[in-house]
Amino acid sequence: MRVVILLLSSFLLLCVNVGQSRAQSLSQQENSKYSPDEIVGAGSSFFGGVSSGLAHLVEHAVSQWGLPNGYILGQEVTGAFVGGLRYGKGTLFTKNAGDLPVYWQGPSLGWDFGGDGARTMMLVYNLPATAAVYQRFGGVAGSAYFIGGLGMTVLAANGMAVVPIRSGIGLRLGANIGYLKFTPEPTWNPL
């Protein structure tokens, strides 16, 4: 009888420990994500006067994709005449792995004309490790910047999503297909 009680109590103790470690793991995953208030706070100081529009876009992104576990703040320039190019640089911020410099480049093709410069905040979803951001993220983009404003697109690769939110200055109108390639060093080659 003692053996049965000992085995049963050992089993229950094991179940409790497994449950606690699973709860701790879920808690750590949630602690590595950014709340909408944290994102809007970081973006408001970065973008300045467009914070109400930013709050609306962040709200929409969170309702679609949940809480991001990273975000990028940076600047970029683009130009297009049917085919286009985009170049940018910024910093990837994460709660559990620190900050990391990132550069991005990308070609696009479609009905797209003009040029713009933009401050960019990119929400990063399902980032397993900071180095995982260094790849190509593809998507369809539409933009209508008329002397300023905000725009949002979605790019995806390997179960991850990057949601760029841009506040641009310039004149650009179009819709295109393209990708962004993230690199640890700057490069002129968008391919």
Segments and roles (model prediction):
Residues L6-V16:
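Bacterial N-terminal signal peptides
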Residues N17-A23:
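Sec/Tat signal peptide C-region and signal peptidase I cleavage site
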